[in-house]
């Protein structure tokens, strides 16, 4: 064989690996493009409206349970409550949506823990891609089913939303865990093995920002189309459900390219999947009579692995700092969106079309924030990652502060509809920047080979706060029947997060993560 032939073969293999690395990143973009409208459009706008709408249709006046909520009898200022479980308990119609959010996140947390351990154990990028598609299909079909409910099926609405949100949680964790793997593989292919560690930081930030912007771009397209769909159904009770149907179809269709794009990051050795997984099993030798995998053990491994990861995280100072800060931040940022939608509908009496327009403004500015903050502002002013997060939080804290002003002034402080449009721009910029920066920061301080499990910790921290936040706001609204009081809660949380974030050192965290990955037991590392 001539040297020319050998060089041609080497070049062919190199080109193959580069193309595969590029396809993996494209597949990662497809994950964001397909699923982001669910959380940005459905969860943030349509589902809260549907839950409140169904609750109002089935609710009664708070001071007289014999009068239906939508009855013209009584004062327009009368608040409404919904009777649950044969009227054993009554909750505010706005609180009902918040309680369902809390329950959905609890279910999401349980399923994320169970699945993430299996994904890390299997260690195959292609398997992670299958997980993205499988759970995406179930989530998309559940979303489509929501659009077919009638307004008396309030428990079915809650149940389908819980399933869909649980599926989104899984693909969110698995998708985020693929980011550092794809970044490092891309750098290895481009430099043919060796690469500078500093390039990981910059490329991770760029790809994460592009992914976030693509996700918001898809959400923007969905919202614009939804505006026309809702306008065509103006005056109909099914106007919101038509928009939900479109979200479900979008999710289902655009995730399909991942089937062909996402593949293993290296040329794989031909090993049967069950053999590979068996070699990684935390319970070696425990298989059924047919020699197949014992899935009970694999499901429990997710919990065992998470417990071990929390033990490892205790050794990683900056991981713990980040998780504590993120618990506080997420409790406020994620809850404030759904609360604002409920507030706009209940207190400002905004139409569905107006709320979709607000959502469009939020999405457009989130796209700008995802690009401008990490790639331009942070670079121009030479902010560290932790400093960037702190400035975003300070920016976002103005939103609840402005809502609090409404207790003291009649002319402003979320007293008029136009104020919601202005705050949508403000909120969108902070949300986009936070989405891009937070993912990239955390991906830099997790031990290599434990991405899925540590991102499940990130998600559990996020979701744990999302269980607590809506639940507490729901209790507050039940007590006061005035959702404006929740702005005090949000502002306090954002202020509390600042001193915690001030302690974060990303360089130190990355160094500690690399050191920990070297001392992890062999059974806990991903096989390359």
Swiss-Prot record:
Keyword terms: Amino-acid transport, Autophagy, Membrane, Phosphoprotein, Transmembrane, Transmembrane helix, Transport, Vacuole
Broad class of the protein's primary localization: membrane
Topology Cytoplasmic: residue spans: 1-98, 152-153, 232-241, 340-352, 410-417, 507-528
Membrane-traversing stretches: 99-119, 131-151, 154-174, 211-231, 242-262, 319-339, 353-373, 389-409, 418-438, 486-506
Residue intervals annotated with topology Vacuolar: 120-130, 175-210, 263-318, 374-388, 439-485
Any Pfam family matching the protein: ATG22
SUPFAM superfamilies: MFS general substrate transporter
A cellular component annotation (GO) from this entry: fungal-type vacuole membrane
Modified residues (Phosphoserine): 278
Topology in membrane: Multi-pass membrane protein
Annotated localization: Vacuole membrane
Superkingdom of origin organism: Eukaryota
Biological processes annotated in GO: amino acid transmembrane export from vacuole; autophagy
Annotated family: Belongs to the ATG22 family.
Functional description taken from the UniProt entry: Vacuolar effluxer which mediate the efflux of leucine and other amino acids resulting from autophagic degradation. The release of autophagic amino acids allows the maintenance of protein synthesis and viability during nitrogen starvation.
Identification of the protein by name: Autophagy-related protein 22
Lineage: Eukaryota, Fungi, Dikarya, Ascomycota, Saccharomycotina
Encoding gene, per UniProt annotation: ATG22
């Amino acid at each position: 064989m001539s040297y020319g032939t050998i060089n041609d073969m080497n070049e062919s293999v190199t080109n193959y690996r580069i193309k595969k690395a590029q396809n993996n990143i494209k597949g990662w973009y497809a994950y964001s493009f397909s699923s982001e409208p669910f959380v940005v459009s459905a969860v943030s706008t349509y589902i809260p409206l549907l839950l409140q709408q169904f609750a109002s249709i089935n609710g009664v006046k708070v001071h007289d349970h014999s009068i239906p909520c939508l009855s013209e009898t009584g004062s327009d200022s009368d608040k409404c409550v919904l009777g649950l479980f044969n009227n054993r308990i009554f909750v505010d119609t706005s609180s009902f949506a918040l309680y369902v959010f809390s329950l959905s996140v609890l279910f999401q947390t349980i399923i994320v823990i169970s699945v993430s351990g299996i994904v890390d154990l299997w260690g195959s990028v292609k398997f992670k891609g299958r997980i993205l598609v499988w759970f995406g299909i179930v989530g998309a079909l559940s979303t489509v089913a929501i659009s077919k409910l009638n307004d008396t099926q309030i428990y079915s609405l809650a149940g389908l939303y819980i399933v869909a949100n649980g599926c989104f949680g899984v693909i969110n964790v698995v998708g985020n865990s693929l980011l550092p793997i794809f970044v490092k593989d891309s750098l290895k292919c481009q430099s043919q093995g060796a690469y500078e560690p500093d390039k990981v930081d910059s490329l991770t930030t760029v790809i994460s920002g592009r992914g976030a912007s693509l996700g918001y771009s898809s959400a923007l397209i969905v919202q614009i189309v939804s505006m026309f769909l809702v306008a065509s159904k103006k005056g109909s009770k099914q106007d919101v459900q038509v928009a939900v149907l479109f979200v479900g179809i979008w999710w289902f269709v655009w995730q399909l390219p991942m089937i062909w794009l996402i593949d293993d990051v290296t040329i794989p050795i031909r090993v049967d999947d069950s053999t590979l997984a068996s070699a990684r099993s935390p319970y070696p030798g425990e298989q059924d009579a047919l020699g197949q995998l014992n899935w009970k053990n694999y499901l429990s491994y997710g919990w065992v692995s998470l417990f071990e990861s929390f033990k490892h995280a205790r050794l990683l100072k900056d991981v713990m700092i980040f998780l504590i800060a993120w618990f506080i931040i997420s409790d406020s940022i994620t809850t404030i969106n759904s609360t604002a939608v409920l507030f706009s509908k209940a207190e400002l009496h905004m139409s569905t079309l107006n709320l979709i327009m607000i959502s469009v403004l939020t999405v457009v500015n989130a796209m700008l924030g995802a690009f401008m903050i990490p790639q331009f502002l942070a670079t121009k002013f030479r902010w560290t990652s932790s400093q960037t997060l702190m400035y975003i939080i300070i920016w976002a804290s103005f939103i609840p502060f402005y809502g609090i002003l409404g207790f003291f002034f009649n002319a402003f402080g979320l007293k008029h509809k136009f104020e919601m449009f202005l705050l949508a721009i403000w909120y969108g910029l902070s949300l986009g920047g936070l989405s891009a920066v937070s993912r990239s920061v955390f991906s830099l301080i997790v031990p290599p080979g434990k991405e899925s499990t540590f991102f499940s910790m990130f998600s559990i921290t996020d979701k744990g706060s999302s269980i607590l936040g809506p639940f507490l706001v729901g209790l507050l609204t039940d007590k006061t029947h005035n959702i404006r009081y929740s702005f005090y809660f949000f502002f306090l949380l954002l202020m509390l997060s600042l001193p915690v974030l001030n302690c974060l050192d990303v360089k130190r965290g990355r160094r500690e993560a690399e050191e920990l990955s070297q001392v992890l037991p062999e059974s806990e590392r991903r096989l390359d």
